[in-house]
Amino acid sequence: MTNCLPTKVFDCFYGQPGTGKSECAARLVEQLYHETGKKSRLVIGDGSLLTYQHLLDAGVAEAVSFQWRIWPLDTLQKLASGWWAKDPSDPNSELVPPTAEILQVGGYVFEGLSVAAAYIMGNIKGGLAWRAGQGEKLGQDSPIRVIEADMDPKTGQPILGSGPGTKFGGNPPAHYNIAQRNMVGIIQQSQGLPARMIVWTAHEAINDPERDALVKEQIVGPEVAGKALTANIQRVFQNTLHLQSVAKRVKVDDAFTGRRVDELDLDYRLYTRDHFNASGTLMVRYKGCTRGVAEDFPQFFPSAAPGQAVLDFYAVLATSRQAKQQALTTPTPRT
């Protein structure tokens, strides 16, 4: 392995499930450990933990899952500020403030942006839907509230003893703004962590051109509690990379006839800038952004398996930036 990571990584990988977001992050954790000997911390809110199991078993990373912890806003803000589980092996261990040990942490992976926003919006204690279920009004909208009991048709109130009385809530429009603004703040807070590498992952979402005051075309970007931030959340990160699987034809040997036949397979691509669907059948723009590179920087990096292209991306990124720097320092001959 050759060294290829920049001095600072603060990037977002987004795409549909199975396109390689977590695989990219896992390979970066491996690369970081190879280059620096430092371990990484994984902040997990979905089922992606299994992707990192070999890193956990090897002691190269440790993980904290947040999706069942109460008070989502407080939990996420603390994790983005360097708080960590007192005992990472205990899924219910309390979070404690950072100590000097944090300086030995080389990287953070937040899995991820979309599930963290859904966690804020959700029904766990402290989540916005939970608050609505308790009757708490946030903003101009009335709380969406469901109580598991029979309702008195005259008063509209639950009949005592007619059901368990469990309260559930939903999300009125005001909740989306609260979740979006706080997620941006949490992402920005994480940038201050004293680690060389900070990576966020996200799922895909498509914007709503009819309601978007600035972007009047269909845009696919990272999902953050609704659609308002889909077209511009990438401005928070250094690089925003889109992962997509694309159908391709390959020649294989038929097991029964022994003949060479065409078969459909998948090419896994890591897109570095805005692009359209590879099939050419959809006029939808997928957001991507790589900063500080030459004009001839590749539009995408292909691989045969999810996540394999990520180190190629960072290696070419380093070469491209070195070329730009050299062009500035090399005198131009006069004619």
Question: Where does each model-flagged region fall?
Answer:
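C-terminal regions of RecA-like/P-loop NTPase motor modules
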Residues: 3-11, 255-335
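Conserved P-loop
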Residues: 2-119
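Surface-exposed intrinsically disordered loops and tails
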Residues: 85-98, 142-159, 253-256, 291-297
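P-loop NTPase motor core
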Residues: 112-231
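A structural signal for short, well-ordered beta-strand segments and their strand-loop junctions
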Residues: 42-44, 107-111, 197-202, 240-242
